[in-house]
Amino acid sequence: LVKCLALAVMLALYSFSGGLHSLLVLSLLVGMMATMAQDIVPAAAILSPAGQQGKIVGTVMTGLLLGILLSRSVSGVISAAFGWRVMYQLAAASIALTGLVLWRVLPRFETHATLSYPALLHSMGGLWKRYPTLRGAAMAQGFLSIGFSAFWSMLAVMLAAQFHMGSAVAGAFGLAGAAGALAAPLSGALSDRFGPARVTQLGSLLVMLSFAAMFALPLLSPSMQLLLIALAAVGFDLGLQSSLVAHQTLVYSLEPKARGRLNALLFTGVFVGMALGSLLGSKAWALGGWPAVVALATLAGGVALVIRLTQKVRPTEIAAQQAAQ
């Protein structure tokens, strides 16, 4: 709730800022406070009934990914009609309203950690060393995020260069990706039934195949190329979201009392992957255009699949997990 209030204030200040330096500082602060979205996920896991954690976490993550995908469309329309400052003011109001709703509906639950904040940060290193499953999940999801970010960061550039379309059209492709994200609760239910490890493998495979399908773009007419890009967006967003929900189910089971820290470590991999994807995507575009971006995304999905297929749970990890519980 404190982050919610702080984020609303930062977004409001951002809308009135005019200098480059103040925008940079406020961008940093907005990014720090926006991590409140990740605080909701372990809370949902804690409140989930036994046997339904995957489904419920999947539902929460659907909202999170839909926000990411649809933000392009919504911000593009509002900014074009009213200016970018209005978009930030509306965002500030929506976050303030979200905080009010959370304050009214979220129950109070006990904290498991009694350590100081520096000690909590230090303990995260121990969690990282103790659980190979956590390391594998963070790395696999990080590589999937590289492909995701490379695609979305360069899509508008490609559409402008090859189809002479504006950023609003690129934002509309987010609607296609949102269709894939809507299936996340189903993937959560499948994790509960068949095990999250299998879902991560299938999700990574779907991401790789969806990106690889775009190698066929030069063989198609312009209208069919756009259709294939939209279908690929549905496919890899579904695969990425399914893998993310399953990875969360995996890591939350390692040490239930440390779910918040485990989630932070998992999403460190996600955010590092997002940043690398934007950087590498622009480099790939400069070197070889859209085919190079597709190759990068396909390779990233393939690496994630290899990680998921080759990782096994070690006896020492099982012992550590049982001791923690």
Regions found by a protein language model. Name each.
Residues L26-G63:
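Cytoplasmic helix-loop-helix junction between adjacent transmembrane helices
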Residues R198-A246:
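C-terminal transmembrane helical hairpin of 12-TM major facilitator-type secondary transporters
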Residues S15-H21, L217-P218:
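Helix-breaking motifs and short loop linkers at transmembrane-helix boundaries and internal kinks
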Residues L1-A12, A92, V199-A213:
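Structural signature of the two symmetry-related core transmembrane helices
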Residues L106-A138:
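Juxtamembrane intracellular "pre-TM" segments in multi-pass secondary transporters
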Residues S22, T59-L106:
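Helix-loop-helix hairpin linking two adjacent transmembrane segments in secondary transporters
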Residues L1, A183-P196, W285:
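Helix-to-loop junctions at the C-terminal end of transmembrane segments
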Residues M10, H21-L29, L227-A233:
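Paired small-residue
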